[in-house]
Amino acid sequence: MQKNQIIFVGFYILGSSLALYTEIKELNMEVIIIAKIVEAVEAVKLVRSGDVVMIGGFGNVGNPKRLIDLLADTDIHDLTVIANDLGTPNVGLGRWVRNRMLKKAIGTYFTYNTEAAELYFDGKLNLEMMPQGTFAESIRAGGCGIGGFYTKVGAGTELTAHCETKVIDAKPMFWRIL
């Protein structure tokens, strides 16, 4: 039986990182990890509409600004971004929000970008928020090939209403996967 593969590609650009992820379609997967140093203009060529893109940093600090800006100048759309936040209006990932490049954002703190909030309430952007520790563990688990995990943090709140829930040791837990 041939295994599907998921490829984790880390680009290190001036101390910042961008990881491209393909969506996991089956659990029986071969994991390939590739690390390269590339120019931002070369990294941009690898991103296609519909991709899942993971960006480091928080609050417009520590993220690959040049890469974000170069992608903002393309016609790429329907991206899912995994990032702590969505920048501020028209700054950092806020450019992607303003350009309507995103279909979904997964992270911890989106309320700083009022344009993202407006698109969310208008039903034009899917935002999936979670506590910071759950976000970090989701990334770690995904990088290790773990399909998901149960956590009690946030269980029973509006943030986890869409998640599978179980009671474990008399505590409500919800299933988390990126």
Where do the PLM segments sit?
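Polybasic, lysine-rich low-complexity intrinsically disordered segments
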Residues: 3-7, 24, 28
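Serine residues within intrinsically disordered or low-complexity segments
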Residues: 16-17
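Aromatic (phenylalanine/tyrosine) cluster motif
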Residues: 8-12, 21
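Conserved alpha/beta enzyme-core scaffold
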Residues: 30-178
